Amino acid sequence: MRKHLVRTAVVVVPITFCMLVSYVTLGGQTPAAPKFKYGPDWPKPLPNKWKMGGVTGLAVDKDDNVWVLNRPNDLVSIEVHQEQDPPLADCCVHAPAMIHFDKAGNVIESFDAPQGHGMAVDKQGFIYIGQNTVRKYDPKTGKVLAAIPHIPENANGQPFDNNPRIGWVKGQGGAGPVAGFIAVPNADGGRGGRGGRGGGRAGGGDGAATQAQLQQSAFIAKYPPTTPMIVGGIEEIRTDDAVNEIYVADNAFGGRVMVFSLDKFEFKRGWGAYGHKLSEISTKPEDHAYTPNGPMAKEFVGHLTFNFSNDGLAYAADRTGNRIHVTDKQGNFKLEIKLAEYTGVGGSAGGVMFSNDKDQKLLYISDLTNNHIWFLDRKTGKVLGSMGQMGESGGSFFGVHMEATDSKGNLYTGEVFAGERVQRFVPADSPRGKLLEQLSRVQP
């Protein structure tokens, strides 16, 4: 584990005024960063010659078993040679999109589903997958049981697809999981792709760009941020079973936190950056723009993930905005935590998890660009340390995307780039952690 000199700041919102605080010293006792040991025995090798794609969902159920949502479409042709007729190699085939592992790392069940992003499991064991909306699945059969309402069309004018198909084709691979993040020079010298932060004009010249802007303006006028349905796609899902609610990060308008009833999927409330009411969310592109090390955007920038703590606070991580916004569950703004503001490309503030102590004193933030898990003091937002670096060996990361914790304090991670795997890290002070430390000291 390494400690980093990272500039962090928070915006604290008392009742009557706002204040920017840069942390130098803090009164009271600051919690220490946790220490973990990589567990090489979890998971076990996948059965049936499966090859997992990029991990886009990770959740621990009530029995401490782990559900993994992966993207089979991420595999390239060389990874699915076993699917050719006749097979070209001993391995591999596309794995099912949903894989259920037990505590020992064995696959206990699986089912296929259309490609998605964001996943949750409720106390009854039902699965919720983010696709072009949120769909509820029976984990035993893989059957869709219900879906959160979505507007009847997409931003491009095409009808909304109520029954998306499984996207991969047997024996065929795609461009790979990193392709969308590679910045390709445009004719004007700008750089497109996700890595360019939208910095390149669409092809077809000014006329095509103007037409696209007009189409977008008409779409927003028809479906403004106050729309009580899903407008875009899904980034994150969390269930709050105790109060019969499900939280969804809709990626429209840079990101909206949307809350629905868990049993009937009826809309209840929502908010944007700084706790903006849905009616206050700006649709101006400049209000969603962010440059690394620059001023924070007025609205969410993009790729919003979400979680809530036991004491009723909600944490919305604006990944490409390099920050986390803390509100209560009604959307009242409390705190802005800035994280590794220098980070470009995919941003620094990914998944949000908490330490498993009673007070959940620590935040665990996954960072697919810097390939760290950041450990923050939840009360202040101060960075206490980090774990991981870019690499392909066990315990390293290449695109660490998703994270989850179990009741024992074990930390699970999922990678979306060439890592395309899940890993488990155990607390260093646990019996297993101490044993792993002893084994690491044994000379070959």
Where are these regions (language model features)?
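Blade/loop signatures of beta-propeller domains
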Residues: 24-40, 87-88, 207-209
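Beta-strand-rich domains and repeat architectures in extracellular enzymes and scaffolds
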Residues: 40-82, 233-241, 245
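Beta-rich, blade/repeat-based domains predominating
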Residues: 51-61, 94-96, 113-126, 154-172, ...
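Blade-level signature of beta-propeller repeat domains, shared across WD40, Kelch, NHL, RCC1
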Residues: 398-444
